[in-house]
């Protein structure tokens, strides 16, 4: 990985070169001596054998060589003095070399040790640097991975922002379309109210003819029912009185019977206690007699067991012996009879204890029977109170009937005028055309609220007015039923969509989100995170549809909150105002064709809506669906 550091040349290397040069010089000297001398001296051979190192042999040979050579020269052949001088100078140098060599060796060892330590330090530093570099590389890799993840998340967030912007644009377009449809639905509502007012006017005339016969039949039927109820109540009262008398007699008899039984049991208890006391006394007396008899028996046995005196006593007569035997037999029989008597008395005591326990267990049952006998009296009191309340109600009914007769006689003169005025006012919305309703909405005065006439002229007018109110109530109930059906249909659709979004990962979840096909332009990869995001969008739309609906209703209503001429009265539309979370919007013919092609209409939740549209063709040719369901339906781009 890293380049090795180049160290400067150490002085030990120069020393090695010197040693190599010295060795070469020694070799040359040896060769020179071998050439000049015919034979090697014996001292040199011995020194070579004893000293193992080459340096010592060389020094010894170099030191003694001048003398030996001189002797050899003088003995064998004469040599020149110049050569001897030349040889003495290198010998002196060779003698100085061993001392300097040992010093250099020690220095070299020290330098080697220091170099080894430096090498270890350098290796340690290199390892630490390698570890630090590895850690830095790991940190750099982790940072690169995190940067990649952040880039991926950034891309996902950008795609989500793009989809949310598109969905917001889509909902803005939908809101505009829904505002237009709300205006159309309000117009249609005004037309339907006009038709209803015309229908009510025609039905009133029919109801006026039938009210007289109906009212008479109702009053007669109510009177007959009241008479029957009175007869039944009287019969029930008589039966209850008789049953009360019987119950009271039974209760008195049972109380007397209980008193007699209590007295008998008390007498028996007293007798038993007296018998127990007498038995205890007899038992004590019998115990005393048994003890006396036992003492007498022990005395007799002792007398029989005593040894005869040395003097011959007087022999008892046979009559005395027989008398003693008879007494013993009599005492034994009396003891057996006493034991049997005691056993009988213990058995009797146990039986009496069991009877006492049974009587104690029966006492709470008898008390409960007494309480049950006392309950009919309470029920009789309650029935008397109910009968009194019924009589009071009958009196109140009679008084009310009398008051109604008087009011009918007094109101006969004023009813015709009010009915004619009401019929004229209610017939006004039906006379105008439906096309100019919106144009003349601000100029026409609001339709008056149909009020209940205070003074009624005849029973026919009363019946017509009541029938009119009943029809309005029926219509409000139908509206409520339709709203409930739409709510159920919407909830089931939303649950199906959310389940579909959560169960199917990938690109389908985005296609099934709010907006239908408008979200198909996104990324086609389709991860599970994107499916979960689309499901979350659907859930958020499902939870917040009420707020959006109220905003659209506020924008579609009149700014001054004044009803138009074809608008319903506030009293008639109270139920519709309470259910402000729902609103029916008519769709165009193109949307109707698409809805027919939609396979969701084959489901059981969508069938009631189609059936209502087929059963009521007069309500319009366009099918109606709550506006918050429109976002889930396939939408055609106009």
Curated annotation (Swiss-Prot):
Which segments show compositional bias classed as Gly residues?
514-525
Q: What is this protein called?
A: Golgin subfamily A member 8S
Question: GO CC terms for this protein?
Answer: cis-Golgi network; Golgi cis cisterna; Golgi cisterna membrane
Cited InterPro entries: GM130_C, GOLGA_cons_dom, Golgin_A
- Its domain of life reads Eukaryota
Where are stretches of biased composition, namely Polar residues?
50-62
Picking any one GO biological process from the record gives:
Golgi organization
Q: Where is the composition biased (Basic and acidic residues)?
A: 434-446
Composition-biased stretches (Low complexity) = 561-574
Coiled-coil residues: 105-160, 223-275, 318-417
What is a single Pfam family found in this protein's UniProt entry?
Answer: GM130_C
Q: Where is this region: Disordered?
A: 1-84, 427-453, 510-532, 556-575
UniProt keyword Coiled coil, yes or no: yes
Q: Which UniProt keywords apply?
A: Coiled coil
Keyword Transmembrane in record: no
Similarity annotation: Belongs to the GOLGA8 family.
Where is composition skewed (Pro residues) in this entry?
A: 1-11
